[in-house]
UniProtKB/Swiss-Prot annotation:
Record note on quaternary structure: Monomer.
Protein name, entry field: Cysteine--tRNA ligase
Entry keyword Hydrolase: no
Annotated Gene Ontology cellular component terms: cytosol
Listed EC numbers: 6.1.1.16
Membership in a protein family: Belongs to the class-I aminoacyl-tRNA synthetase family.
Protein encoded by which gene: cysS
Residues that hold ATP according to the record: 273
Length: 473
């Protein structure tokens, strides 16, 4: 088992991973609130932790992966009422849709997917423990709040000082006169008319959002576990509040390592329904093969913000198609012949990239070089070497969950064919990128852009007057 480093959000640096139990990793990732179809931001979180777990398991780690489902929430109640259906009908439908989307993206199912409504008793036990310890208090209206000033380390994950904080619009913090401090957060909400509720020592009601994850994670993995993950938007207040209530309740450190996946912007702007640039996974799959979406996500480092656009998806399709063409060229000559003797130099370079905070951008660069060597070996009819390189490439793409479809079926797929046609403006933009690359003497990038355009039906010709282009016949 090769040692690896990961970026711990709490420490704000890359650190070497040390397991609580030798050879084992317990991981909890915040899942979806199931009131609508999953969007591309959800896709990134699902895919990122999927390839991370695939890689760790390929290294011999025994990973226990928990991803929760929030099936009781203000948004769920509102949507069910708008639709005139029960909460269970709504959540069941969108849980099924979520699982279908995840499967289409090539994501393995988590070892366990606890639902919030299945852990109400455990949530109440944790809340009662916090009240008994003086870290939480019941309000006169039946709500129960966590008292943030009673937890000295509050703000350590997000790097915020309590006195400097200001509530943000997206922070899901209820502002109530019953609070002792503006940042006290609700653990138990009193029952309201036409809302689901459960009996409790504080009256009928339902759990707050944050307590759900603390109860589910500790019930599934214990009071102290290895890795907690989620989207960057959850760092504050959700994960900050999880730490406070969990550690105040158990008296133990909650999590050793925090991992957060970066944002997805759409055409340079934050994805938002109000901006009209909000896309569900299903929206995107109408234009692009789901493995193209996965490739787009895998090709960037999980912590880096990425820009989602049709151009980016077209580039992803072109790049992914290269691997399929290489596999097809090999299979036409050698069939499905493989060998257990893999090229260890490529394996080592790939593993080194992934062991450095799961650097898939660097890992993909290794795969492109390997793909190029495979094409050369097939062209030069070097059968033994071609088989080793093909087997190595297949092994490594499997770890990333790529090139998982039948070669001919993928290449014949018409998903996204209309979207693949580059506009004139997009072509001119690529040409300018190529000019800039040549000026910087980055000839490899310049050649890559030329080849990418050629594969998309655009022919470049360099003349004394500059580069001209035409669409291939």
């Amino acid at each position: 088992m090769q040692p690896f480093v990961l970026y711990n959000s709490e420490q704000r640096k890359k650190v070497e991973f040390v397991p609580r139990k030798e050879g084992h990793i317990d991981m909890y990732v915040c899942g979806m609130t199931v009131y609508d179809y999953c969007h591309i931001g959800h896709a990134r979180v699902m895919v990122a932790f999927d390839y991370i777990i695939r890689f760790l398991r390929s290294q011999g780690w025994k990973v226990r992966y928990i991803r929760n489902i929030t099936d009781i929430d203000d948004k769920i109640i509102k949507r069910a009422n708008e639709n005139g259906e029960t909460i269970q009908q709504l959540t069941t439908r969108f849980i099924d849709a979520m699982n279908e989307d995840a499967a289409n993206l090539g994501c393995l199912a988590p070892d366990e997917a606890p639902k919030a409504t299945e852990y109400i008793d455990q949530m109440q036990n944790m809340i009662g423990n916090l009240v008994n310890k003086g870290a939480a208090y019941p309000a006169s209206n039946g709500d129960v709040y966590f008292e943030v000033t009673k937890f000295e380390k509050y703000g350590r994950l997000s790097g915020r000082k309590l006195e400097d904080m200001q509530a943000g619009a997206s922070e899901r913090v209820d502002v109530e006169v019953e609070k002792k401090h503006p940042f006290d957060f609700v653990l138990w909400k009193h029952a309201k008319e036409n809302e689901p509720s459960w009996a409790s020592p504080w009256g009928n009601g339902r759990p707050g959002w944050h307590i759900e994850c603390s109860a589910m994670s500790t019930c599934c993995l214990g009071n102290h576990f290895d890795i907690h993950g989620g989207g960057s938007d959850l760092m504050f207040p959700h994960h900050e509040n999880e730490i406070a209530q969990s550690e105040a309740s158990t008296g133990e450190q909650y999590v050793n390592y925090w991992m957060h996946v970066g944002f997805i912007n759409v055409d340079g702007e934050k994805m938002s329904k109000s901006l009209g640039n909000f896309f569900t996974i299903r929206d995107v799959m109408e234009k692009f093969h789901p493995e193209v979406i996965r490739y787009f996500i895998v090709s960037s480092h999980y912590r880096s913000p990425v820009n989602f656009s049709d151009v980016a998806l077209k580039e992803a399709k072109t790049s992914l198609t290269r691997f399929y063409h290489s596999f097809k060229a090999y299979q036409q000559v050698y069939g499905q012949t493989t060998t257990e003797a893999l090229d260890q130099s490529f394996i080592e370079r790939f593993n080194n990239a992934m062991c450095d905070d799961f650097n898939t951008a660097e890992a993909m660069a290794v795969l492109f070089e390997l793909n190029k060597e495979l094409n050369r070996a097939v062209k030069e009819e070097q059968a033994d070497q071609a088989t080793v390189l093909y087997s190595t490439l297949r092994h490594l793409t499997n770890i990333l969950g790529l090139v998982q479809h039948n070669v001919d079926d993928f290449l014949k797929s018409d998903i996204g064919q209309d979207a693949l046609a580059l506009s004139d403006a997009e072509i001119e933009d690529f040409i300018q990128q190529r000019v800039d690359a040549k000026k910087a003497k980055d000839f490899a990038k310049a050649d890559s852009i030329r080849q990418s355009l050629l594969e998309q039906g655009v022919v470049l010709e360099d003349t004394r007057q500059g580069t001209v282009w035409r669409r291939a016949d």
